[in-house]
Structures are given as structure tokens and as C-alpha cells.
């Protein structure tokens, strides 16, 4: 507990500073520019929080799977993902839905093979991810606004050694980019040197971010490769960090056991 208190104090001292398939970061083609999205309030989602006893509270930081979720390279969102194949209203004995979507839709994890072919060939799929890294104490920090996560920014955050899981909240949350179906390539994320600084000078093994890519658009490939080539970093993208206070939490993220897949939708919660 003393260690967690120290981390929280350090955090307070730190400054606040044709369309691709969902999650397809394999190249950086010229993507369509969408019209400016209206400034609308985020729709209400069910199950955003609740008591778990003992004064603790569950915070759901997973975006609901909905047709309006953004996808890089599209102005129209991901579209309908769930289709009712059988309906009791039409005489079937049960209601039966079908789900079809990219494994990088909405809140999801990247496996090492996502952008490093040798790891894909070696079978380092989402089913090989370390659940121990996806569950445990995590630190939520605020990145200086209007800034990518560069090496300089990483150093300024003063994240203590020993912290293994960090969720980075950026201006993407302020701009409510995950609530807009239009792709917005002005999102911020890690630069290559920021990723290198994290790998070289911290003990962080889980990196969580608040938009579809851990890397900024300009650094899409190189920053991903820095993380994924190491095999030791787990990336969680498109987290819903609205209205969550900075500090220490217990993080629980569980991806699907998709054998052979380089990513998976994931349900992530924080317990305070």
C-alpha cells in the first residue's frame, strides 16, 4: 500500500498535461478526410460502474460494440456488426444473432504478430498473451494535451520504476474521438522515440491508450514495431477513459481465446 501511495503522489505531481478494415495498420495510405463531426455528447452506455462491496467500485472502460464505432480510413463507422439470424417474432424457437467484425474493432488488444511477421509465423497469437499482464495494478496518467507521447513527454510523466501497467489518457478523450464515427487522423499517440523510451527506461509491460492506435498516424508502423517486436509489451487500444480520475486501480482485461488471431476484442474494467 505504501508503494501505491507513493505512485499516486508522484502522479499528482506530474503535469496533466477504399477504407481500411478496422484496426488495419499495415500501411499508411492517403485516407479520406471526413467532414467535421458535430460536437455531440457521448451516448449513455449501460454498466459503466457499480459497487463490488467493501467500498470498491467497478469502472467499465470498454466501448460498447456499436455500428457508430470509428474505423481508421472510413467516414461511416464500422457499420452493423450484429445481425439477428433467427427471430422468435418471425416464428423461430429462439433468437439467434451473428457477430462479424475485425478483431481490432473498438476496445481491443494487439498480439505480437500484429505488425511483426516473425512473431506471427511463430504462432504468437492472442491466445499466447500473458493474462498476468492483463490483470493487476495499473496507473492512469494524463498526457500533456495537444502532444503525442514522445520521449520527452514520457520522461516528464515521472512514472516510477516498478509500475508495469499504464493507461495513457490524451486529448483523444477530450475530443471524444471514439464517440465519432468519422475517422480523425489528428489523433495523438506514441511516436517512435516515445515507444523506445518506454521500452528502454521503464518497467511498463502493458500500454493502454484511448484511441484505435497506440501510435500516432505519422508513426503508425515504427512505434507499433518497437512495442510488438519486444514480445514483452501488451497493447490495449481504444479504452474508454472518460470521467476516470488519474491514479492507481486494479485493471482486469480479458481477450477472447482466438487461436491464430493477431488481436482480439477485450472487456476491460478498473476496480477502485
From Swiss-Prot:
GO cellular component: extracellular region
Induction: Induced bycold, salt and drought stresses. Induced by abscisic acid, auxine, brassinosteroid, gibberellin, jasmonate, kinetin, reactive oxygen species and salicylate.
Disulfides per UniProt: none
Principal place of residence: secreted
Keywords: Extracellular matrix, Secreted, Signal, Stress response
Tissue: Highly expressed in leaf sheaths and flag leaves. Expressed in roots, stems, leaf collars, glumes, young panicles and pistils.
A GO MF label: arylformamidase activity
Any single biological process term in GO: L-tryptophan catabolic process to kynurenine
Pfam families listed in its UniProt record: Cyclase (PF04199)
Signal sequence residues: 1-17
Locations listed in the record: Secreted, Extracellular space, Extracellular matrix
Membrane-traversing stretches: none
Family membership noted in the UniProt record: Belongs to the Cyclase 1 superfamily.
Function: May be involved in response to stresses.
Protein name (database record): Cyclase-like protein 2
Organism annotation: Oryza sativa subsp. japonica (Rice)
Lineage, broadest ranks: Eukaryota, Viridiplantae, Streptophyta, Embryophyta, Tracheophyta
Gene behind the chain: CYL2
